[in-house]
């Protein structure tokens, strides 16, 4: 999660919403990809940290199935990212801060508990949550 927080810091410095993600090989615990939100620079609403990381990981291993990998993300995934996590079959999801506005894992939609979700990763929340929360708070304080 510390590496995901570093990625969130990079996003913060680029005036992107500070969310970072890393995907880790479960067998050797090595990070295979890391990413951060990039919606402003790319002018594309789809460039969330999770989507970028999943795309890069699939390209790296030449597979759409990431069942031997875990994702660490600093903020509770939105509906789009939760669906991408399910579709790519990541084994475990670790996230930091909850997102009361857009979170779709445990805060609002609860995507993985819905009837439309066909795959549910193991979910672990609250990891370094305060660090993530503070970074988000600073970011939105700065832009308002």
Swiss-Prot record:
Reactions catalysed according to its record: adenosine(34) in tRNA + H2O + H(+) = inosine(34) in tRNA + NH4(+)
Co-factor binding comment: Binds 1 zinc ion per subunit.
GO molecular function, one term: zinc ion binding
Matches recorded under Pfam families: MafB19-deam (PF14437)
Residue span, CMP/dCMP-type deaminase domain: 1-116
Biological process (GO), any one: tRNA wobble adenosine to inosine editing
Cofactors, names only: Zn(2+)
Keyword Zinc: yes
Keyword Zinc recorded: yes
EC number: 3.5.4.33
Record-linked InterPro entries: APOBEC/CMP_deaminase_Zn-bd, CMP_dCMP_dom, Cytidine_deaminase-like, tRNA_aden_deaminase
Residues making up the signal peptide according to the UniProt record: none
PROSITE patterns the record matches: CYT_DCMP_DEAMINASES_1 (PS00903), CYT_DCMP_DEAMINASES_2 (PS51747)
Active-site residue list: 50
Keywords: Hydrolase, Metal-binding, tRNA processing, Zinc
Residues that bind Zn(2+): 48, 78, 81
Family the entry assigns: Belongs to the cytidine and deoxycytidylate deaminase family.
Complexes and interactors: Homodimer.
PANTHER family named among the record's database cross-references: CYTOSINE DEAMINASE FAMILY MEMBER (PTHR11079), TRNA(ADENINE(34)) DEAMINASE, CHLOROPLASTIC (PTHR11079:SF179)
Role: Catalyzes the deamination of adenosine to inosine at the wobble position 34 of tRNA(Arg2).
Full protein name: tRNA-specific adenosine deaminase
Species of origin: Rickettsia felis (strain ATCC VR-1525 / URRWXCal2) (Rickettsia azadi)
């Amino acid at each position: 999660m510390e590496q995901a927080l570093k990625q969130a810091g990079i996003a913060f410095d680029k005036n992107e919403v500070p969310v970072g993600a890393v995907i880790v090989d479960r067998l050797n615990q090595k990070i295979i990809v890391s990413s951060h939100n990039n919606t402003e620079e790319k002018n594309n609403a789809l460039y969330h940290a999770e989507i970028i990381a999943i795309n890069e990981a699939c390209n790296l291993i030449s597979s759409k199935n990431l069942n031997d990998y875990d994702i660490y993300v600093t903020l509770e995934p939105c509906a789009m990212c939760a669906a991408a996590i399910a579709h790519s079959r990541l084994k475990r999801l670790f996230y930091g801060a909850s997102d009361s506005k857009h979170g779709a894992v445990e805060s609002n939609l609860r995507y993985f508990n819905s009837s439309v979700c066909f795959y549910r990763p193991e979910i672990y929340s609250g990891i370094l949550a305060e660090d993530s929360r503070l970074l988000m708070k600073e970011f939105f304080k700065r832009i308002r």
